[in-house]
């Protein structure tokens, strides 16, 4: 019997991750793919107008934009991150994400 360490998503298939969640007006949608004490991988969909307010994480946070464009503030630096682009937010630095346009992302936090 094979043991799988991921959840909520098919294994041994070619995937377009952004197709596994939909935008819902007024809601931030998330699907956890993997999580343990050293790693967290989560899909997010933020419709236009939603945000993830300023916070810090223990661990580097790697954001990969799958669809749309995210406005991300890391410390005092602002970024507009578009489809296909990646931004690494260092551990324990305050950051926030704003959907000036709808976007989907894959978030990987490594501790």
Q: Which sequence ranges carry the predicted segments?
A:
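A cytosolic small-molecule/anion-sensing beta-strand core signal
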Residues: 37, 66-67, 82-83, 101
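A short, N-terminal "cap"/entry segment at the start of jelly-roll beta-barrel domains
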Residues: 1-38, 73
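Glycine- and acidic-residue-biased ligand/ion/polar-headgroup-sensing regions
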Residues: 59-71, 75
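Short acidic-glycine-tyrosine-enriched beta hairpin
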Residues: 76-91
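Conserved short histidine dyad/triad with adjacent acidic residue
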Residues: 26-27, 37-57
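Ligand-binding loop in jelly-roll beta-barrel domains
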Residues: 91-111
